Structure formats: structure tokens, C-alpha cells
């Protein structure tokens, strides 16, 4: 066992769970719940570092770049999950937010042994995407030293991309490799070394923050409404209708009519209702202001 493993919080034993195998089920659950409560406070201390990643992503995506997550195991699966949720939630192109996982698609469903140990393979898989200076590449590694992930961020840096990382140990190897490190220590796991637990929760919450705050920065919300939702199923069509009603105060019938004329696009429908425009006029108005509803409907920004 090397010194890095000895120092890693994610590999440490949790004194509170040393008798785990002797506890009644309810006590096991209480213990896990208590430990999970440590996660938000641990994240809170790193909000400025997370904000720096978001600001870089907003800048890069605004210039046509991509947000690329890369991880192995649980970390990789969470990155793929977050990326996959962006198109239906924000109508993004599937290439705008991308998730890479060591071992490829198969690794989403079952472990691919040894995949995470190949740094060269990580670099090769990133290079397939031809990263550039407008891209932001975020390495996800609970330990902060997964070779495949380190290989990815090194390749990203060589290509001139902005690099970031999210890990759950202090003074992690990957932190010294990236421009924007995020280190969140939520303490050792209830089940020693099982980083699918608190470390996984840390990464899920941070990814939620990165993607959501980035999309807010790109103008894909109006207030707290997901006005760029893609109405690709009945639930989302109903949501789009509710969003138009909430944003404008219009009736259900008026929202349905506006959405029909807008081709299901909630942003267009909102501008139509608020400004009394046709769908064509509303689309043109949104195009003038980069698709930001707040600016589109603000009288101070309307052309005289």
C-alpha cells in the first residue's frame, strides 16, 4: 500500500462505522443518513471553486465550446448521467455537454476491470473529440489520482482546453494537473473505500451545480423556469404549458395556442404572450438577444 493510499480520506476507516456488521438494520440506515448530512457542508466550503468552473463553462460554451466530463466507475457514470439530462432539460445539442467513462459504453452497466488504470487510453479517448481552447474538460475522480482521468486532463491541457477536476481528497494528484481544482472532503465512507457512497453523492451534487448554473448563465432559464425544455414526451409537453402559464400569467388555453404556434418552443411562446407578438416576431426578437427571455421582454432592451 503506497503513501497516497494511506493519506487518502476516501480510503480511510470511519470510526463511527467500525461495528457496522453488528448493527441492526435501522441503526445502519441512521448511520448512513448521519454521514450523508456531512456532504452539503463539505461542498459549501468549495462553492467559490465550483463557481470558477461554472464561469469558465459559461464563457467556453458561449464561444461554441463544450463541457466534457470524464471519469471512471461511479464518477464516470454520474458524468454521463448529468450530460444526458441536458438535452431534454435545456434543449442543448447532445454534443454541448459530453460524458466520457473509462471502458466506454459497456462500463455504464458493468465494471470494466483495469480500464481506469490506463492513462494513455484516457488521452486517446479525449483526443477523438478533438478538444480545443473553448472546451472545458472536468476530470471526475473520487480519489483524485485515477490514471485514466489524469490522462484525460493532461491531454486536454495539451490541446489548450480549460481543465478542472472534482475529487474527494485534499492535495490530490489530479488537482496539480488542472487549472480549476475542486477538492471536497466529506470524510471516510461508512463502508471503507466504497466511494459510490458519500463521494458519489458529492460528485452528483457538484455536477448538478455545474450543469444547472452553467445553463442559467447561458440564458436557458427565466426566473426558476426551464424555458428551454424540449417537449419530447407528454410529461414535458404538460410542463411546457405550465411554464408558459407561470411565466406570463395567461390561461391554459392561451398557453396551448401560443405553444402550438411556436412549434412547442416555450421561450417563443412566452415572448409571444408577453409582447403580443407573432411566433415569427418572437423568434426574431429572441435571436436579437441571444435567446435570453429576460432580455427579450425587458422594455429597456426593446428597439424603438
Curated annotation (Swiss-Prot):
Active site: 85, 116
Cited Pfam families: GKRP_SIS_N
Record GO biological process: amino sugar catabolic process; N-acetylmuramic acid catabolic process; peptidoglycan turnover
Catalytic activity from the UniProt record: N-acetyl-D-muramate 6-phosphate + H2O = N-acetyl-D-glucosamine 6-phosphate + (R)-lactate
Domain SIS: 57-220
InterPro entries: Etherase_MurQ, Glucokinase_regulatory_CS, MURQ/GCKR, SIS_dom, SIS_dom_sf
Function: Specifically catalyzes the cleavage of the D-lactyl ether substituent of MurNAc 6-phosphate, producing GlcNAc 6-phosphate and D-lactate.
Record-stated family: Belongs to the GCKR-like family. MurNAc-6-P etherase subfamily.
EC code: 4.2.1.126
Name this protein carries in UniProt: N-acetylmuramic acid 6-phosphate etherase
Entry keywords, A to Z: Carbohydrate metabolism, Lyase
The species this protein was found in: Cutibacterium acnes (strain DSM 16379 / KPA171202)
General remark: A lyase-type mechanism (elimination/hydration) is suggested for the cleavage of the lactyl ether bond of MurNAc 6-phosphate, with the formation of an alpha,beta-unsaturated aldehyde intermediate with (E)-stereochemistry, followed by the syn addition of water to give product.
Complex formation: Homodimer.
Gene Ontology MF terms: carbohydrate derivative binding; carbon-oxygen lyase activity; ether hydrolase activity
Pathway membership, UniProt: Amino-sugar metabolism; N-acetylmuramate degradation
